[in-house]
Amino acid sequence: MALALGGGGVRGYAHLGVLWVLEEAGIPIRGLAGSSAGALAACAWAFGHKDPWKVHQAVFDKEVANLRRAGNLRLLARLFSALRRQALADTAKVAEGLKRLFGEARLEDSPIPLAIQAADLLTGEAVVLRQGPAWKAVLASAAIPGLFPPVAWEGRLLVDGDVAEKVPVRAAKALFPKVVAVDVSNPPPNEPPKTALEAVLLAGEASRRRLKELALQGADLVLSLDPPFPIDTFDHEKLPLVYTLGQKRAQEKLREIQALSRLRLKDLPHLLAPRPPRPA
């Protein structure tokens, strides 16, 4: 089977917990598609970096982490100062960390087929990367618009893959017909907005949530993180929680995952790509 690993900041470390459970259960992984934090998890696992704490240490940027701790006035001041800049934060330290983590590794050389999803900043189109430096593909897939600068890639400006599709189910299907989608989204808010800005942000989130739900319909099985409370994108102190929660959710659905893994492809005719007609 292939896994579609969705974005979610620090919640993305749950993917490594899920993959650990599948490996322990002897379930073969035929492909990994990742978007944003899911891209980091997919590449890390495929190239043998399975310890979430070591991965986190490689990419941790104190400046980015401080965005969460900044008070509203300080954050607002930074936003206004960034209006004339390309992004709120620099990615130089993150890029260096990714280079140290992945070295010269390239997507096409991965032991597990990889599909890293980013988005074209100008068109919003999903861009699935199958070749190129792993570190740069992850950087592009996680470039949150406004927060991080876009990444130039073959004449395009690429940003966070979540802009196009939060959980890259279609990219995973292109790797292998049987797909387990792992959604690490926060639960929807249960309180009404208090300001006009909050209302605008909530409306955008609601729209993206609906698009995500439509994408998840293409998966054969959906594994949702369902955290007990909202976990901030950059709340790195929650890493142990999300990792163990990922393990727990995978264990809860292990029988279903095993059943899907054993299902023969010929029993899934609606999922297989049509074969070209034989010559007469």
Where are these regions (language model features)?
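Patatin-like phospholipase
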Residues: 1-4, 9-94, 98, 130-139, ...
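Catalytic domains of lipid- and phosphate-ester/thioester hydrolases
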Residues: 1-23, 27-30, 41-46, 174-177, ...
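Short, hinge-like loop/turn segments at secondary-structure boundaries
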Residues: 48-51, 196-201, 240-241
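Short, basic, helix/turn surface patches
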Residues: 55-68, 205-220, 255-256
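Alpha-helical membrane-targeting segments
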Residues: 65-89, 189-208, 267-276
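Active-site-adjacent alpha/beta core region of enzyme catalytic domains
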Residues: 71-189, 221-223, 228-229, 233-260
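Helix-centered, glycine/charged polyanion-binding patches within enzymatic domains
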Residues: 178-223
